[in-house]
Amino acid sequence: MKKVLADKESLIEALKLALSTEYNVKRNFTQSVEIILTFKGIDMKKGDLKLREIVPLPKQPSKAKRVLVVPSFEQLEYAKKASPNVVITREELQKLQGQKRPVKKLARQNEWFLINQESMALAGRILGPALGPRGKFPTPLPNTADISEYINRFKRSVLVKTKDQPQVQVFIGTEDMKPEDLAENAIAVLNAIENKAKVETNLRNIYVKTTMGKAVKVKRA
């Protein structure tokens, strides 16, 4: 494992602290747990660091990501059986043309938008204007995909993406999960970006924290 990646033991140690009462005050909701990577010597305006990786988490968080699916006619029944949060047929998608309010609601409520290839252009026209400002996008649903496996994978997937600051902040689970499971999810995120340009040479620090809690710095070799 490369030196920029924190080992599992260091992650577990930091996560235990982040979940402790010293760093995390209990709220009346289940808080998310995030990993934060900060970078040095990066000019985001010049595009020095560009990350956009979809990462399936090995341990399913209790808060599954919401998935909207636009399947082909042949995929429709399989898609319904896989229990995504929303299933929309191509015909129903067409009827949303010009319907800004319901389209914005779908964009706001769902995280992933799996679109069969035959409907990608249509989805881009209808959903795109609402998805773009939210940093979301249609993802192709191949004709040959195992629908159930594909949908379930995205229910536990996160997007690792840089914005306008030299850092990335990624959901890795919820505070009711074991530190060991959260650490596995954190490692999946780190492994997905370790070979990207500027990550190894410009990584400053790694932190973990709950939604409302204090950040805990992860020890690195």
Curated annotation (Swiss-Prot):
Belongs to the universal ribosomal protein uL1 family. One of its GO terms (molecular function) is structural constituent of ribosome. GO terms for cellular component: large ribosomal subunit. PANTHER family: 54S RIBOSOMAL PROTEIN L1, MITOCHONDRIAL, LARGE RIBOSOMAL SUBUNIT PROTEIN UL1M. Part of the 50S ribosomal subunit. Pfam families: Ribosomal_L1. One of its GO terms (biological process) is regulation of translation. Signal peptide: none annotated. It comes from the Archaea. Gene3D superfamilies: 3.30.190.20, 3.40.50.790. This is Large ribosomal subunit protein uL1. Keywords: Repressor, Ribonucleoprotein, Ribosomal protein, RNA-binding, rRNA-binding, Translation regulation, tRNA-binding. It comes from Sulfolobus acidocaldarius (strain ATCC 33909 / DSM 639 / JCM 8929 / NBRC 15157 / NCIMB 11770). Probably involved in E site tRNA release. Binds directly to 23S rRNA. Protein L1 is also a translational repressor protein, it controls the translation of its operon by binding to its mRNA. NCBIfam families: PRK04203.1 (NF003244).
